[in-house]
Structure formats: structure tokens, C-alpha cells
Swiss-Prot record:
The name this protein goes by in its record: Patatin-like phospholipase domain-containing protein DEHA2B04136g
Ranges annotated as spanning the membrane: 136-156
Recorded topology in the membrane: Single-pass membrane protein
Coiled coil spans: none
Length: 788
């Protein structure tokens, strides 16, 4: 009776599993797991021998096609290894059939496989006598010292937490905070946040435009100039000014500190600037004074300058189900980015988000989705013998079948992009520690099947064995191995958050990172507050308009930074000297020393009891709790994301309306079609040759470059053209993120950029100020002041 009354999940009864594809996956895994291919004889085989081997392989393939996936392990004895796609590099594949004599194939045991893995990782630097004698004493000493540092770090953090709990969060202030944390939706959260701001007198902070972390004077001048040009109808000059101010972190307006002094809101001047820029962009779109080609060049230019926004979902075992709430909060507010990356468990949520439309996704992000999350359902008496036999707790074939629901069957990255317009990115790492990492997406691997990359990204040593990627062969419509020389495993071992790769492929300059890794969350500490969560300052100080303070005071913050940097230093030494043993054929030193943060980093709160369920499937009640926890963690960042995406969407609107269709690609701009500019604007105008119409544009030509019939398709493995802002020196994102993680790079980029405004902001300020001073034609303005 209970089952008949339960709410039905969208698409719950649809079986997306293609058993033929699962069988092909099983064949590739069985060959790789049971046999090793020794070195081939240098002398080539005769043509008669090759044809005989080809006939044998064809016969064996026909026999295997009649077997199920579970019968393959006993049917492969004495057969030839199937052809794989090998490569010299990521972009140079060679599909060759190698005839391998049966005498060169031998059975491979699990223990020998492990030993061989260790021998592959061992390098010549470990062979010296001094290394052999001193390695373990040094490692033991460093480990003891790190343990002591961690203990002292925990003491400092406990002191800060207790002082805030007993001395700051008391009385009505505590009641208002508890009310804020209990908000059920975003609208309710905003009202509660504003009430808390008013009680703490934080709303008055927004009224004063001056702040050391951005250039308020430049922002004021920009607003004034844009408004006057728009009202006077000087659309051409307006377009030139917009070219200079629409770019990443212009005048420091994307500094996190601007959103870290209130629970909801920022400086009113910043909000006014964003509103004015959007109005001016719409003015350029509707303008009759500006030619079509000039509009098109303008929007291509500002799109490169401003960049794209991406959502990055980290790994973290079953903590990753909190990402569902992050995605739901963004989707409900129409702020879900079109570029989403995921690693390990985060890849599952990313795949669901990119293979479904908005309407479908809203129907799936409900507690009933827990019925489809059954990866850990095997009892202990099933998985313990499996782990003892195979070295992995979970079965790859079962996970492949269960992942099909989240990927809509054997959907490829290109098919997902064509269906929803979202660009899915899954980070995978070769099982060989010295091979390059690959970010699977619609550019690098458009025909790769998503569920195979999900399994590869989830293949943590001891949890799931490395797997082979699969791709669709467009000529035969079959599934074939997509192997670039090795199997693939969990991407979080090396690149949990692939920000640099996203910038390379998609010009991503702004990243929203949802980080749930428990070994990283412990070290999250925002000494100056974070977005939507200001430092807990006593009310007596806020009423005196003293809004800046450090968590726990200067001494506590200094000790926290000292201990964290010391831990990072010694971990880096372990990695540099290669002291850590390679357990399970993997170098584990990278899991602490990556970049784990982004422009905005969300850290959902994990409770101690959550660790009990770290490798278990959620019930509907627990998934509902995780959805709510993820939403509440995202609410404080919604305003920041909204401000960023509002300009990005306005630019995209202009690009869509001015984009040339495929039938008009032969059109070129002529001098006669140029618009008239004022003398000062003419000095700053971009030369047409700088952005030629024939230049590759990642947004406008995705369909052409990634089409299955295109000559640059992945089957041909032509190197993709990434000229759309990818070769720009300043294209990479280095936001100051001293609050997050243990990365040395994160600690090096402190938030003191607010005082100096950085080289980029200075350039933008010089450009605008020089333009404003150009009242007379005698003032000479140079193109080098224009920032692109």
C-alpha cells in the first residue's frame, strides 16, 4: 500500500541501459584485466599471417557477441586482444591492428599486477644509497611534525569557534541567525538576511561608496559617462566605453570582499554600475547608428574580455549528493551556468544536469531521486569477497548499468551538448601517474560515452578499479574502446577542480566551486569573512560603523595562517622528495596540494554523523536533507552570481542577435560600412584586422567544429582551434582565495589586491580617466590604454 501511494519519479520507469554497450565494456575490461601484452617481435609478420589472425579475431568476436557480460571472464582464454585506439598524444591517435602470437600472452595475477605497478612508478632517483637510508627516517619525522601542527591548528580553530559561539552569537543576534539558517527558500532567506543586516547596522555599510578593495572613483566616472552618452544618443562612443569597462574584475568590482560585509547586498554603487552596463548593452543592441559588423565585432570582443562562468562540482564520496542542492538553488533562480564540470561523485550530478533540460531537471531534483542512487546497495558479505578477489569494493559493470539513468543511456558529450546546450566536463586521470590528465568534454572527446567517463572519474584505488573509456564509432554505429594508452581513474587524485583546463577550452574566467571533500573542508577558514557570511563583529562596533575585523582577532588569525602554511610546506617537501610510498599504484601526495577553490567557493557544512554514511546510499529523507543543506549553502552566493551572470547574459543576447548564420559566412565588412565616431572615440576604436571575421569563435561555431561529419571531428583528432581568448596571457583565472584549501597558489594570491587594485584594474582606470579628460581634441589617446 505504501508503494502505490508514493510519489513517482520523473522517468523512473524508463530503462536506459543498452546491454550491447555494457557487453562491449565488459569485453574491454576483461581483456585488460586478465592478460598483458608483452613486447612484439621487431620483425613484421607476413601478409598471410596477418590475414589469418584477422580471420581468427573475427571468428572470436562473433562467438563473444553471443555471450552475456557476466560470462565473458571465462570465455576469453586463448583469444586475441581486441584492437584499441592508441595514441602518441591526446591529439594524435593511431588505430593499428597488431597480431600477437598466443605464446606471447600469459595469465596475469592480481599480486603481480600490483608489483608491476610499483615498478613502473619507481624511478632512478630512488636508487641512491642515501635515499634508501634516509627516506623513512625523514618521512617519519615530517609526519610527526605535521601531526603536531594539525593538533595546534585544531586548538586555534576551536578557540575561534568557542569565542564566537559564547561571546558574539548571543541574544537576539543568535535568534536572527538561527532564523536565517532555517529559511526554506531563497525569498525567505533574503528577508531574514536583510533583517539581520538591519539589526547589526550593516545596511549602512552599503551607502558609503568608498572601500579599499575596489576603485570607487573609476566606477563613479564610468557610470556618469555611460549615462550621459546613452541619454545623448551617442551610441558609437557608448560602444567604445563599454569595450573598456566590460571585462573581468573591472575596477575590482568582482572582489569577494564587496560581498563579504553583509549577509545580503553589496555597495549600492556596484549595483548601480551593473544596472547601467546592462542598460547600455541593450542600447547598443537596439541602436540603428551602429553597423551590423561593428556590433558583431563589439560583442565578440567584450565576450572575450569578460569570459564565461562555470560551475565546478568536487568529489567527496557520498558528501557529493549535497551538490544536488547547489544545482537546484541555481536552477530555481535561472542562474545555472552552461559550463559544468564534475569529478568523481560530482561528475554524476554534473552529468544529470547536462543531459536534462531545465524542466526535466526540476522534476528530478527531488528526494525521490534517492531510488535511483543504489551504487552502494551490496551488503558486506558480497563486497568483502569481491574486494579480496579483485582489489575493489564495487563492480564496474553494475556501476555502469546504474549510471545509465543519470546519463540518459549511452549519451555522448556531443549529444548532451546538442540536446541541452550545456557543456559537460568530466575530469579523469590515467592509471599511469606520468601520463597527462584529460578533461572529457564536447571538444576533447565528443563521441566518448558519458557513463564510461563517470566510472573512470570515480575509480578510486580500493573502491573501483581503473576502467577503459568507450566511444561511439560513427561509421559502424558500434561502441569501441577509447584508450589513449592506459586505463583511467578518479580525477580528484590530481585535478579535482580543473579551472585552467576550463579556461583553455571555454574561456572561463569566473568559477563557482562547490567543495565537499572532507579532508579539505577541515582547513576552510575565512579570516576576513566570505560571500554572504561576514565576520561576527560585536554590535557595539557596527553601530560605530567599524565593519572590518578578523575572525578571532589578529593573533588567532595569524596563528591559523602560520600553521596552515607550515603544513602545506612540509606536504610539498614530501611530494618534492618523493618520500610517500605509492600505495595501490598511486601517488597520493597530490590530494592535498591541488587548487580546491574558485572565484566563489561553497563549503556545505558536514556534521560528524555524516561520516558514517560516507559510502552508503541516501534514503529519501537523507537526500531531502542534503538538498536543503546545499540550497542554504548556495543562498548567500546567489546575489554575487546574479550580478556576474546578468552582464554575461546581456552579452550573450547581443551575440545571438548579431551572429552571422552559416549562409552568410562569406560576408566581410567594408570600409564603407564603418560608422562615424567622435575624434576621441576614433582613437580608441579597435582595428578590424584584430578580430577577423574568419577567426574561430568557440560560441558561434560549436555546431560546425563538433559536428560528427566535420573534418575536424574527434575521429580525425584534429587539434581544436582555441583562439577565442585562450591565448591571452591574462585569460587564466587567479582570484585571491586565501581562505580556502591548502594550495600554495591559493595562499600566494592574498586579498591585498584591493589596496593596489592590481595591474589589470589600474589599466582600466587609466583608460577611462584618460577618456574622460579628452574634452579637447588636443588630448592624445593611445590604443594601448584600451584593455582587451
Amino acid at each position: 500500500m505504501e508503494k502505490t501511494n508514493r510519489k513517482k519519479l520523473f522517468d523512473e520507469d524508463i530503462d536506459y541501459v543498452n546491454e550491447d554497450h555494457i557487453s562491449s565494456f565488459a569485453k574491454a575490461l576483461a581483456w585488460e584485466e586478465q592478460y598483458e601484452i608483452l613486447e612484439n617481435e621487431k620483425s613484421g609478420a607476413s601478409s598471410d599471417k596477418e590475414s589469418q589472425d584477422a580471420a581468427t579475431i573475427q571468428k572470436e568476436t562473433e562467438e563473444l557477441d553471443d555471450l552475456g557480460a557476466d560470462e565473458l571472464s571465462t570465455a576469453l582464454n586463448g583469444m586475441h586482444k581486441p584492437d584499441l585506439i592508441s595514441s602518441k598524444s591526446d591529439w594524435w591517435p593511431i588505430n593499428t591492428s597488431k597480431s600477437i602470437p598466443k605464446t606471447k600472452i600469459r595469465k596475469k595475477s592480481k599480486k603481480s599486477s600490483v608489483n608491476e605497478g610499483h615498478s613502473k612508478i619507481t624511478n632512478e632517483f630512488r636508487s641512491s644509497a642515501s635515499y634508501t637510508m634516509l627516506r623513512w627516517p625523514i618521512l617519519i619525522f615530517i609526519s610527526c611534525w605535521i601531526s603536531l601542527l594539525c593538533f595546534m591548528y585544531i586548538i586555534v580553530r576551536a578557540y575561534v569557534a568557542l569565542s564566537e559561539y559564547f561571546l558574539t552569537w548571543v541574544g537576539k543576534r543568535k535568534e536572527l541567525r538561527n532564523k536565517l539558517r532555517a529559511s526554506q527558500n531563497y525569498e525567505e532567506w533574503v528577508q531574514n538576511a536583510l533583517e539581520l543586516d538591519r539589526f547589526l547596522n550593516l545596511d549602512k555599510w552599503s551607502e558609503n561608496p568608498k572601500f579599499s578593495y575596489y576603485d570607487s572613483k573609476t566606477v563613479e566616472l564610468t557610470i556618469s559617462k555611460l549615462a550621459s552618452l546613452r541619454e545623448e544618443g551617442r551610441d558609437n562612443d557608448l560602444m567604445v566605453i563599454l569595450q573598456g569597462c566590460i571585462k573581468k574584475n573591472f575596477a575590482g568590482i568582482e572582489n569577494r570582499q564587496l560581498y563579504s560585509h553583509r549577509y545580503y547586498g553589496t555597495k549600492y554603487l556596484v549595483e548601480k554600475y551593473i544596472d547601467e552596463v546592462i542598460v547600455c548593452i541593450d542600447k547598443v543592441i537596439e541602436s540603428q547608428q551602429i553597423s551590423f559588423n561593428d556590433k558583431r565585432r563589439f560583442f565578440r570582443t567584450v565576450s572575450k574580455n569578460y569570459g564565461k562562468t562555470a560551475l565546478c562540482l568536487s568529489g567527496g564520496a557520498c558528501f557529493t549528493y549535497t551538490h544536488f542542492g547547489i544545482v537546484k538553488a541555481l536552477l530555481d533562480n535561472d542562474l545555472l551556468p552552461s559550463i559544468i564540470s564534475g569529478t568523481s561523485g560530482g561528475g554524476l550530478i554534473a552529468a544529470l544536469s547536462c543531459t536534462r533540460t531545465d524542466d526535466e531537471l526540476k522534476k528530478l531534483l527531488v528526494p525521490e531521486l534517492a531510488r535511483k542512487i543504489t551504487a552502494c546497495e551490496d551488503p558486506w558479505y558480497v563486497w568483502i569477497p569481491r574486494w579480496w578477489r579483485t582489489g575493489a569494493r564495487f563492480d564496474s559493470l553494475e556501476w555502469a548499468r546504474k549510471a545509465n539513468f543519470f546519463t540518459r543511456g549511452s549519451t555522448t558529450f556531443y549529444e548532451s551538448f546538442k540536446r541541452t546546450g550545456r557543456r559537460l566536463n568530466i575530469s579523469t586521470v590515467p592509471s599511469n601517474p606520468h601520463s597527462p590528465v584529460i578533461l572529457c568534454n564536447n571538444i576533447t572527446s565528443p563521441n566518448c560515452i558519458i557513463w564510461s567517463s563517470l566510472l573512470a572519474s570515480s575509480a578510486v584505488p580500493g573502491i573501483l578499479n581503473p576502467v577503459v573509456l568507450l566511444m561511439k564509432d560513427l561509421k559502424t554505429d558500434r561502441v569501441v574502446p577509447f584508450s589513449l594508452g592506459s586505463k583511467w581513474r578518479d580525477g580528484s587524485l590530481r585535478t579535482d577542480i580543473p579551472i585552467d583546463a576550463l579556461n583553455t577550452y571555454y574561456n572561463v574566467n569566473f568559477s563557482i566551486v562547490s567543495q565537499v571533500n572532507p579532508h579539505i573542508s577541515l582547513f576552510f577558514f575565512a579570516p576576513k569573512g566570505t560571500v554572504g557570511r561576514p565576520v561576527a563583529i560585536p554590535r557595539r562596533k557596527t553601530h560605530k560603523e567599524k565593519y572590518a575585523s578578523l575572525r578571532g582577532g589578529f593573533i588567532a588569525t595569524a596563528l591559523e595562517q602560520l600553521f596552515k602554511l607550515e603544513i602545506t610546506k612540509w606536504l610539498q617537501m614530501i611530494k618534492s622528495l618523493d618520500l610517500l610510498p605509492h600505495l595501490l599504484e598511486q601517488d597520493w601526495s597530490n590530494i592535498w596540494l591541488q587548487r580546491f577553490s574558485g572565484s566563489i567557493t561553497i563549503w556545505p557544512r558536514n556534521r560528524l554523523k555524516d561520516f558514517w554514511y560516507i559510502l552508503s546510499d541516501p534514503t529519501e529523507e537523507r537526500l531531502a536533507e542534503m538538498l536543503s543543506k546545499g540550497e542554504r549553502a548556495m543562498f548567500p552566493r546567489i546575489l554575487f552570481v546574479k550580478h556576474r551572470l546578468s552582464i554575461e547574459k546581456a552579452i550573450e543576447k547581443g551575440r545571438k542577435q548579431t551572429k552571422l548564420s552559416a549562409n552568410f559566412n562569406t560576408l566581410t565588412s567594408s570600409d564603407s560600412g564603418r560608422t562615424e565616431l567622435s575624434p576621441e572615440a576614433a582613437e580608441l576604436q579597435v582595428e578590424p584586422a584584430m578580430f577577423d571575421d574568419d577567426e574561430y569563435d568557440s560560441d558561434s561555431s560549436d555546431d560546425e567544429v563538433l559536428s560528427p561529419n566535420n573534418k575536424k571531428h574527434i575521429d580525425k583528432f584534429g587539434t581544436p582551434n582555441t583562439e577565442d581568448g585562450d591565448d591571452d596571457e591574462d585569460a587564466y583565472e587567479y582570484y585571491d582565495d586565501d581562505d580556502y584549501g591548502l594550495s600554495t597558489e591559493d595562499e600566494a594570491n592574498q586579498e591585498n589586491t584591493g589596496n593596489s587594485q592590481g595591474e589589470e584594474n589600474d589599466t582600466g582606470s587609466r583608460f577611462l580617466k584618460s577618456f574622460f579628460r579628452a574634452g579637447s581634441r588636443d588630448s592624445k589617446l593611445h590604443r594601448r590604454n584600451t584593455v582587451f
